[in-house]
């Protein structure tokens, strides 16, 4: 199977290319924090030679509680994104939830993301595809890896073949997620070789059945990320925070920003090793 390459400026995203780090924070908490987090990622990835894309949401529209922080909104969020691009020269990925958001967001950022809970909403998928932007599709927690092929087809039917697929875990009973490492190759096959990335942060979520916010398993972020890269994928999706215990969203799953360099260094070593192996022919 031929691996497709999705280009984001001078970055090649493909399953057989060096992994790309899609890293940042869960939600924009402030302009200053976004600058701090982005600068930390840029310094680490430039030092280690890892391709990098900044990620954050301007609106967490699917929070469990009506009282939870959602973000600064689209208008203010896009101003922050533009400043990050102007200051650090980074590429940016963010999610959209409404049809009217698609074009204005695509005019500023480099990748627009289709949220997992909305991935089968055809009108939204079509509106995103018609912007011509690169699209990152989050696999819904309730969908099998093979079913991602249908979402890819919707996007391609609109004339857009710049597609990245992202696994963020699968429902395992109530209030728990697991990651099927065999699912990455299934998604590659279902999409005829599209780049597949792994959202290690959100795969660590663990819900409190009676609570208003998700818990998480931060202590296992390294082992889960290592496992994902070991199967040969295009990138990792990671959230880090200066103080995860004070984060306004998903802090229990976020990597401490102080641990970023050690984490990325390990991931690069694993990715380099895995992609140095020749592909084995196991057919009969």
Curated annotation (Swiss-Prot):
Q: Which GO terms describe its cellular component?
A: cytoplasm
A biological-process GO annotation: keto-3-deoxy-D-manno-octulosonic acid biosynthetic process
EC numbers: 2.5.1.55
Compartments reported by the entry: Cytoplasm
Protein keywords:
Cytoplasm, Lipopolysaccharide biosynthesis, Transferase
Q: Give, as in the UniProt entry, the pathway in which the protein acts.
A: Carbohydrate biosynthesis; 3-deoxy-D-manno-octulosonate biosynthesis; 3-deoxy-D-manno-octulosonate from D-ribulose 5-phosphate: step 2/3; Bacterial outer membrane biogenesis; lipopolysaccharide biosynthesis
- Supply the enzyme class, top level: transferase
Q: Which domain of life does the protein's organism represent?
A: Bacteria
Catalytic activity, as annotated:
D-arabinose 5-phosphate + phosphoenolpyruvate + H2O = 3-deoxy-alpha-D-manno-2-octulosonate-8-phosphate + phosphate
Q: Could you confirm whether the keyword Oxidoreductase appears in this record? A: no
Q: Which InterPro entries match?
A: Aldolase_TIM, DAHP1/KDSA, KDO8P_synthase
A molecular function GO annotation = 3-deoxy-8-phosphooctulonate synthase activity
Which family is this sequence assigned to?
Belongs to the KdsA family.
The record, for PANTHER family, names: PHOSPHO-2-DEHYDRO-3-DEOXYHEPTONATE ALDOLASE
Protein name listed in UniProt: 2-dehydro-3-deoxyphosphooctonate aldolase
Q: Which organism is it from?
A: Haemophilus influenzae (strain 86-028NP)
């Amino acid at each position: 199977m031929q691996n497709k390459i999705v280009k984001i400026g001078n970055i090649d995203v493909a399953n057989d290319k060096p992994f790309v780090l899609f890293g940042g924070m869960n939600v924009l908490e402030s302009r200053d924090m976004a600058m701090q987090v982005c600068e930390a990622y840029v310094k680490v990835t430039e030092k280690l030679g890892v391709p990098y894309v900044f990620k954050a949401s301007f609106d967490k529209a699917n929070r469990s509680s009506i009282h939870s922080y959602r973000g600064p909104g689209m208008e203010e969020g896009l101003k922050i994104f533009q400043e990050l691009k102007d200051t650090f020269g980074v590429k940016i990925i963010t999610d959209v939830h409404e049809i009217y958001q698609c074009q204005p967001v695509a005019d500023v950022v480099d990748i627009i993301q289709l949220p997992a809970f909305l991935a089968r909403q055809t009108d939204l998928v079509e509106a995103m595809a018609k912007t011509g932007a690169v699209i990152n599709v989050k696999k819904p927690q309730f969908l099998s890896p093979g079913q991602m092929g249908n979402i890819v087809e919707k996007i391609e039917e609109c004339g857009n073949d710049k597609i990245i697929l992202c696994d963020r875990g699968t429902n395992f009973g109530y209030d728990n997620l697991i990651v099927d490492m065999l699912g990455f190759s299934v998604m590659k096959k279902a999409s005829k070789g599209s780049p597949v990335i792994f959202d290690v942060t959100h795969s660590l979520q663990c819900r409190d059945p009676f609570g208003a916010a998700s818990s998480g398993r931060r202590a296992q972020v390294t082992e889960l990320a290592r496992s994902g890269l070991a199967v040969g994928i295009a990138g990792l999706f990671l959230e880090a925070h200066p103080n995860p215990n004070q984060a306004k969203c998903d802090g229990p799953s976020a990597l401490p920003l102080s641990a970023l360099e050690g984490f990325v260094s390990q991931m690069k070593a694993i990715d380099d090793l895995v992609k140095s192996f020749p592909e084995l022919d196991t057919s009969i």
